[in-house]
């Protein structure tokens, strides 16, 4: 008699019928948003040559990537832990066109350690802009992000901007003197919401 128990590896997520339909519906809504902002959809493979997966510096990618010997050419292939490096390689192929490129992607990734995620096989969604960065591009990518996050119907959205140049440019465009601008920047760094409102 066959064992009817169904086991899946720890940290790996399955989508059952109802969840799969909801998931696909959400995926199509996200694709429509990408199309609205003229981002071109690409689907890189989950297995790729190691050099395509490790184009970004950092031990995280190196340590988390599952490596497999490719006996057909004595090379090494890996299972991606992040799709972003593959986008860099895709953009490199069209570098000679000398024009800004917008790419978007969605796909499974696999991590040895689930730290920072709710599973070992999270589904990654992202957009990459390759070209000269401007204030317009910064605003565009933030609006795109907000449109996608809004699909979650969360009542509160918090966006942390790691690059202070955006905040500095924003504050420079406000009609305030340099002293107030400096105080406001300090409050922003301290995340002092009450003081920011009072300012």
Please tell me what each predicted stretch does:
Residues 1-199:
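Extended, charged alpha-beta segments that form solvent-exposed binding/catalytic grooves
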């Amino acid at each position: 008699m066959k064992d009817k128990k169904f086991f899946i590896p720890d940290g790996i997520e399955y989508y059952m019928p109802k969840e799969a339909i909801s998931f696909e519906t959400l995926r199509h809504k996200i694709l429509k948003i990408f199309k609205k902002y003229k981002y071109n959809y690409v689907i890189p493979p989950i297995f790729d040559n190691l050099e395509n997966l490790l184009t970004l510096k950092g031990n995280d990618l190196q340590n988390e990537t599952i490596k497999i010997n490719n006996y057909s050419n004595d090379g090494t292939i890996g299972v991606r832990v992040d799709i972003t490096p593959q986008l860099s390689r895709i953009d490199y192929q069209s570098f000679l066109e000398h024009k800004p490129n917008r790419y978007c992607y969605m796909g499974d990734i696999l991590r040895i350690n689930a730290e920072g995620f709710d599973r070992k096989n999270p589904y990654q969604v992202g957009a990459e802009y390759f070209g000269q960065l401007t204030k317009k591009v910064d605003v565009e990518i933030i609006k795109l992000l907000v449109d996608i996050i809004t699909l979650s119907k969360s009542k509160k959205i918090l966006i942390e901007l790691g690059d202070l140049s955006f905040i500095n440019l924003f504050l420079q465009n406000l009609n305030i003197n340099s002293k107030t601008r400096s105080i406001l920047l300090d409050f922003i760094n301290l995340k002092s919401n009450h003081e920011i409102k009072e300012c």
